[in-house]
Amino acid sequence: EISCSLVGSEMCIRDRSSNIAVVVPSFQNNDRNYLIVSGEDFTLEFNKHNGYLCRYDVDGMQLMEDGSALTPNFWRAPTDNDFGAGLQHRYAAWKNPELKLTSLKHDIENEQAVVRAEYDMKSIGGKLFLTYTINNKGAVKVTQKMEADKSKKVSDMFRFGMQLRMPVTFNEIEYYGRGPGENYSDRNHAARIGKYRQTVEEQFYPYIRPQETGTKTDIRWWRLLNIGGNGLQFVADAPFSASALNYTIESLDDGAGKDQRHSPEVEKANFTNFCIDKAQTGLACVNSWGAIALEKYRLSYQDYEFSFIMNPVYHKLK
């Protein structure tokens, strides 16, 4: 029996079935471009130029799309409501906050590998900290922390979370949260909390014009799996929101002005684009098309911290 827990700021995995010695992860730092973390059945790579996790292999299974990275994400493809309120302009700084890596450190702590990356947010004026804690099973606790510059006046943001691209074969979803349809912080009272099994293809709603779609809220755990039942499970110490689509945020984004495209015109991506958020701004328009979300459903510029665990799900042949 193996249990995984996230309590406060600590991650631990306990194997109660044996007393086999723990194989502590190790670092390889002799590559000019990548910091490599390896264990008994897994390999992770961090790009030394931007600090991002860019490779995640477990038991020979590739969990990240080639050429991609786990990246901070503050933007969504604006909805019709967002356009009505002009949020594509008002929130524009969050589309590319110009993150600049200022520090990348690594160490072994409590028999776990720890990687810490620090960033300046040039267009926002704050600082971002990403911490990755990797245990002997290849599970990764990710902590995303932002310290706002209180002296600056900065707009609200669409979301606070991260984005991950997985190979297209990871197209099966299991989750415990609100469903079965898409739901948002100010549009979820009719969505029942329960356990759901769906496909990535089912997540996209073909609005007349492409826009944000597919998010689920109040999630306790979320799994993205392939046909063999292998993949990743995401858990956090508080309910979170998530989505998985065969479309990128960029492909659904009409930019500063509506392109008058239609959803069938958007080209599908050949991978699964997963977004995991501490929170996302509500859909708004309570009393008019141009109204922004109520204050309790908005994400103001302030300090934030979000932690979640990526736990490999795989059936090891003995």
Where are the model-predicted features located?
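Single conserved hydrophobic/aromatic residue that forms the stacking wall/gate
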Residues: I2-G8, C12-D15
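Beta-strand/loop-rich accessory regions of lumenal/periplasmic or secreted enzymes
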Residues: R16-K318
